[in-house]
UniProtKB/Swiss-Prot annotation:
Protein purpose: Facilitates the functional incorporation of the urease nickel metallocenter. This process requires GTP hydrolysis, probably effectuated by UreG.
The name this protein goes by in its record: Urease accessory protein UreG
Compartment list: Cytoplasm
GO cellular component: cytoplasm
SUPFAM superfamilies per UniProt: P-loop containing nucleoside triphosphate hydrolases
Keyword Signal among UniProt keywords: no
Gene: ureG
GO MF terms held by the record: GTP binding; GTPase activity; nickel cation binding
Annotated keywords: Chaperone, Cytoplasm, GTP-binding, Nickel insertion, Nucleotide-binding
Organism: Staphylococcus epidermidis (strain ATCC 35984 / DSM 28319 / BCRC 17069 / CCUG 31568 / BM 3577 / RP62A)
Annotated InterPro entries: CobW/HypB/UreG_nucleotide-bd, P-loop_NTPase, UreG
Binding positions (GTP): G11, P12, V13, G14, A15, G16, K17, T18
One GO biological process term: urea catabolic process
């Protein structure tokens, strides 16, 4: 059984977590063996969405119904996600990379370091310019931070320059990117980070 690298994807409901996974997997699946675990509270909606996109065979995607606080399932009691990892590897023992998508949660959500090797936290511009200024452990502690849906900035009166400045205050030199995943704008920076900072470090 392989020992895959695991990347956690966290962020509020509707920020673009599932779409991010779809776009990234579509690019990387030609180069390596990938699996995905999604977390929803009472459904397996995100699993269905990814299956319907066809980015991966159905046996490489597992949906977890957390049945409660999504934060607990990725940190305090991640047993359901550990079980899902085992099931994925039983189905496909060649998997090299697993994405674990959390259920939509607040700015404080972080992944257990025992569950994932790296984490990405994503918000969207529509939540307001002030979000990066509020900080939050999800944004501060993540290895990579994404501000998605940049196309909405004019409609909600958000300054991307101000959001960038506020992000740098909390994250310092740690990487982040602006994206519009609908058009793939900014996606390349995310891919480059995964290929160079995650895969190269994780495989050494």
């Amino acid at each position: 059984m392989s020992n895959p690298i695991k990347i956690g994807i966290g962020g509020p409901v509707g920020a673009g977590k599932t779409q991010l996974i779809e776009k990234v997997v579509k690019r990387l699946a030609k180069k390596m063996s990938i699996g995905v675990i999604t977390n929803d509270i009472y459904t397996k909606e995100d699993e269905k969405i990814l299956v319907n996109t066809g980015v991966l065979p159905e046996d490489r995607i597992i949906g977890v119904e957390t049945g409660g606080c999504p934060h607990t399932a990725i940190r305090e009691d991640a047993s359901m996600n550990f079980a899902a990892i085992d099931e994925l590897l039983e189905r496909n023992d060649d998997i090299e990379l697993i994405f674990i998508e959390s259920g939509g949660d607040n700015l404080a959500a972080t992944f257990s370091p025992e569950l994932v090797d790296f984490s990405i936290y994503i918000i969207d511009v529509a939540q307001g310019e002030k979000i990066p200024r509020k900080g939050g452990q999800g944004m501060i502690k993540s290895d990579f931070f994404i501000i998605n849906k940049t196309d909405l900035a004019p409609y909600v009166g958000a300054s991307l320059d101000q959001m960038a400045k506020d992000t740098e205050v909390f994250r310092g030199n740690h990487p982040f990117a602006f994206t519009n995943l609908k058009t793939d704008e900014g996606l390349e920076k995310v891919i480059e980070w995964i290929e160079h900072d995650v895969l190269l470090k994780g495989l050494t």
